[in-house]
From Swiss-Prot:
UniProt similarity note: Belongs to the glutamate 5-kinase family.
A GO cellular component annotation in the UniProt record: cytosol
Binding site for substrate: 52, 139, 151
GO biological process, one term: L-proline biosynthetic process
This protein's encoding gene: proB
GO terms assigned for molecular function: ATP binding; glutamate 5-kinase activity; RNA binding
Protein known as: Glutamate 5-kinase
Species this chain originates from: Synechococcus sp. (strain ATCC 27144 / PCC 6301 / SAUG 1402/1) (Anacystis nidulans)
Binding site for ATP: 11, 171-172, 213-219
Function: Catalyzes the transfer of a phosphate group to glutamate to form L-glutamate 5-phosphate.
Reactions performed catalytically: L-glutamate + ATP = L-glutamyl 5-phosphate + ADP
Length: 370
């Protein structure tokens, strides 16, 4: 039995869902995954499935050979494919007596605090009802600047949202390697990662752009988001879904990313990962030190430069003078006001703006370290 109804998020990508030799879904892989998820449910786990494949299924249904490049066409094709994909899942899960639900999300659903809370409550109700939520990005209505961009990131944000204990990223390789094993015979497997800084040399590339900017790069980003939310993350082979059962039984399969100790509350996790920054504040060394080491709020005096056009209460990146992000937070002034008061002492703000505002630019309660 699962300890205390643990929650798992399982993400499967298009490469694992589709047949590499001919168009269409890899039904044997999907059926195997469905069977494993049903076993996990019987063991007491709550399971969320994040499934790609809507655009690919839509292309097959419409007889299109290539993935569309135009956004509007891709969104239309996703609408065609999503229904067929869900029908496949529903048929397979129904055979095993497991109810499912479709949950389509956009980044905007997580960027607004009330909608974020509503999404959390919906997932909790589905778990109470014994339902497996199947999640995908709502491609048909998502605007480019508010897209998750990939389902790896979406799955990590969902894992953080539902306070999962595990995130499984099912892919077309069996684990993470020091280079692309399909291109480099000297690539070495990586079995466990205690800190993502250990992988900086891999993330920097050097083995060809396909490996550095493709699917594995997004999985490392997802692992960072999830582990910061204390979610243990595993990359493993998608065509062997039975690996999930073996991993939960303690077998060292795939690449494990150890969770970081929980240091922030749910609201700060939302600020760190749910929001999309609309601006950037460049800070002097004193402000950087005060925020990183002292846990202080950001004052106007520490701001050297401002980038972007944003409103009060928008999310912004806080960066050192090299442009390296050190934190994120909710700003108390809009970009026009900040241009006037940057570098000033807090008691000068009312004289400059002509009205009394907040003493802090970003209060420490609305700030989270990167």
């Amino acid at each position: 039995m699962a300890p205390m109804s643990e929650t798992l998020v399982v993400k499967i990508g298009t490469s694992s869902l589709t047949n590499p030799h001919h168009p269409g879904l890899a039904l044997s892989t999907i059926a195997g995954l469905v069977e494993v998820i049903c076993q996990l449910r019987r063991q007491g786990y709550n399971v969320v499935l994040v499934s790609s494949g809507a655009v690919g299924v839509g292309c097959t249904r419409l007889g299109l050979r290539d993935r569309p490049s135009r956004i509007a066409q891709r969104q239309a094709i996703a609408a065609v494919g999503q229904g067929r994909l869900m029908r496949t899942y529903d048929d397979l899960f129904t055979t095993l007596g497991q109810p499912i639900a479709q949950v389509l999300l956009t980044r905007g659903d997580l960027a607004q605090r009330q909608r974020y809370i509503n999404a959390y409550q919906t997932f909790q109700e589905l778990f109470e009802l014994g339902v497996v939520p199947i999640v995908n990005e709502n491609d048909t209505v998502a605007v480019e600047e508010l897209k998750f961009g990939d389902n790896d990131t979406l799955s990590a944000l969902v894992a953080s949202l539902v306070e999962a204990q595990w995130l499984f990223l099912l892919t077309d390789v069996d684990r993470l390697y020091t280079a692309d094993p399909r291109q480099d015979p000297n690539a070495k497997p990586i079995t466990i990662v205690h800190d993502l800084s250990e992988l900086e040399s891999i993330q920097a590339g050097g083995q060809g752009s396909r490996w550095g900017t493709g699917g594995m790069a997004t999985k490392l980003t997802a692992a960072k988001i999830a582990t910061q939310a204390s979610v243990r993350t595993v990359i493993t082979q998608g065509r062997s879904p039975e690996n999930l059962l073996k991993i939960l039984a303690g077998e060292a399969i795939g690449t494990w990313f150890e969770p970081q100790p929980e240091t922030v509350n749910a609201r700060k996790r939302w600020i760190a990962h749910g929001l999309v920054p609309t601006g950037k504040l460049l800070l002097d060394a004193g402000a950087v030190q005060a925020i990183q080491a002292g846990g202080k709020s950001l004052l106007a005096a520490g701001i050297q430069a401002i980038e972007g056009d944003f409103e009060a209460q928008d999310a912004v990146q806080l960066c050192d003078l090299n442009g390296t992000e050190i934190a994120r937070g909710l700003v108390n002034y809009d970009s026009h006001e900040l241009q006037q008061i940057r570098g000033c002492q807090s008691d000068q703000i009312v004289q400059i703006l002509g009205y009394e505002g907040a003493e802090t630019i970003v209060h420490r309660d609305n700030l989270v370290l990167s």
